[in-house]
Amino acid sequence: IHRLWLKGEKRGERDIFIDQLPALPDNLSFNDRDKFWVALVSLRDAQFESWASKIWLRNILAGLPVSAFDSMTHSKFGFAIALDLEGNVVESLQTSAGSIYSITSVNQLDDDLYFGSLTMPALSRMKIR
């Protein structure tokens, strides 16, 4: 995940906010105080990793419907992390129970987290305090 500075001395500069994530990030939200929530849609896959340097293959794959990747990417594993303002992981939420998976968004509203997914038929909510 890269960070682009919008204000201050570093305005216009870009740096790495966090890397080497164990899963693929899909969406990022800020709780307006001290945490960035990152939805991790799928665990990393060695096959996908090997395709990263093959631009021609990535272009072909980008044109396929999401459903073409369901069997490879959408395990019944739910994963989200919270980062502090410096990019350090301060919370890690994981489940393999299958109740929530393929998380594409995490939003905090007061003491609740709301999880969204393109493949699940409903929104999920979790108390955090």
Located regions from the model:
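Sequence-structural signature of mature extracellular/luminal beta-sheet repeat domains
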Residues: 1-129
